Amino acid sequence: MGGRFIVFEGVEGCGKTSQMQLCAEWLQSLGISVVLTREPGGTELGLDLRRLLLQKAEDKPIAEVTELLLYAADRAQHVAQELKPKLAQGKYILCDRYVDSTIAYQGYGRNLDMNLIHQLNDIATGGLTSDITIWLDVDVEVGLARKRGDNVGLDRIEQETIAFHRRVQQGYADLAASSPKRIIRVDGQLSKETVHKTIQEILSVHLKQWL
């Protein structure tokens, strides 16, 4: 059985982390070997980069292009050290964010050059794309309200303006429209149980082809 790469995407507070965990437990109950990972931070180097990227904005300002390059460095290490080897072992990888996050956040949110972003993504991934991407779609204000309710403080990205987060949301909508077979929209504002059931139904269709 070959490995599969399943990515979870969405704006802040969309519920990716909890849905990934529920999905992992469900897949494991089917006898599938699952790996949970994330970007940034899927390797030891990535954890250091994550601390730099997500520290509060007032601590150490990061230039926008620097931010883009740090995300690319995190991804290149992640792909080489974790993703490709685990897929070669037949693992099912559930990943919290991947290339679409860079397009949505740095491309749409920061208005950085999209050609540069695609070039860096191509270099960092070595051509590795997701088998399927689950986009948990929530209104940005709902998502940010969820994050504030966590009582853990907002990180540098979460502290951005509503206008920034709305541009990111538009980025995801455009990506889903341009890649409807790879990116599947799920209404993230439904109950946790309903969202999980929807994801199960989506993946069940693919599992019939994969297993």
UniProtKB/Swiss-Prot annotation:
One of its GO terms (cellular component) is cytosol. Keywords: ATP-binding, Kinase, Nucleotide biosynthesis, Nucleotide-binding, Transferase. Coiled coil: none annotated. GO terms for biological process: dTDP biosynthetic process; dTTP biosynthetic process; dUDP biosynthetic process. One of its GO terms (molecular function) is ATP binding. It is an enzyme of class 2 (transferase). ATP binds at residues 10-17. InterPro entries: P-loop_NTPase (IPR027417), Thymidylate_kin-like_dom (IPR039430), Thymidylate_kin_CS (IPR018095), Thymidylate_kinase (IPR018094). Gene3D superfamilies: P-loop containing nucleotide triphosphate hydrolases. Its EC number is 2.7.4.9. It catalyses: dTMP + ATP = dTDP + ADP. Belongs to the thymidylate kinase family. PANTHER family: THYMIDYLATE KINASE, UMP-CMP KINASE 2, MITOCHONDRIAL. HAMAP family: Thymidylate_kinase (MF_00165). Phosphorylation of dTMP to form dTDP in both de novo and salvage pathways of dTTP synthesis. This is Thymidylate kinase. It comes from Nostoc sp. (strain PCC 7120 / SAG 25.82 / UTEX 2576).
